[in-house]
Amino acid sequence: FKGGSVVSGKGVRRADLLVEGEKVVSLGRGIKAEEDRTIDVSGCVLFPGFIDAHTHFDLEVAGTVTADDFASGSRAALRGGTTTVIDFACPNKGESLASGLGRWREKAVGKTFCDYGFHMTIDDWNEGVRAELPEMFAQGISSFKLYMTYPAMLLGDRDLYWALKELKTLGGICGVHCENAGVINGMVAEKKAAGELSPASHPQTRPPYLEAEAVGRLLRIAQAAQAPVIIVHLTNGEAL
């Protein structure tokens, strides 16, 4: 690739880029090599491939399925310069982690056009789930997601505490979807009773201060567990 502006960890500079196979092997001005193909990228910016670490492909949720499967989603990713996606393997409540991971691998294998990996959601906490975790790490799964909302997924404060402690012991990292499920459910019931069912009612049942409460509660639970935690997809400054 000749004449582009290359973005690296050291900044942006005009340079040529030589790629062999899937690897960058040389970066500089006036590279001379017996390359098979030269592409003039003058006026273009060359980035390393981006990583989207939070996708939901072919996910059945709320009576529907997310818009993209692994084929269409990975093609769209590549068009935007994303060369790796990390999706969420989502076992159903009562399903083993291994079974859920197997189903997600079946969704992806032979259909995905970019590199991919998996996080694992945990929607139940019991001895069986805890006992499966070492095998998940052996399978390459070291990042997990927990929910503080949605009836089929939420963990209570006690289970959040135990899950965070166990994942820290194993060397994993955990992301948490923070909402106050109880109050939201109450507000939703009030809106339904009043017949206020338009899209405008949705944010009214999820005010910023409730997300902030859930974030604060999670941080205290993580403090008690002495565990690191990631808070996923914040929506407002108060929660931040």
What are these regions (language model features)?
Residues 4, 22, 77, 81, ...:
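Residue-level signal for inorganic ion chemistry
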Residues 41-111, 128:
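Metal-associated gating/positioning segment near the N- to mid-region
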Residues 87-113, 122-127, 134-135, 141, ...:
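Active-site loop-to-helix "anion-binding N-cap" substructures in soluble metabolic enzymes
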Residues 98-115, 162-176:
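Alpha-helix-loop-beta-strand connector modules within alpha/beta enzyme cores
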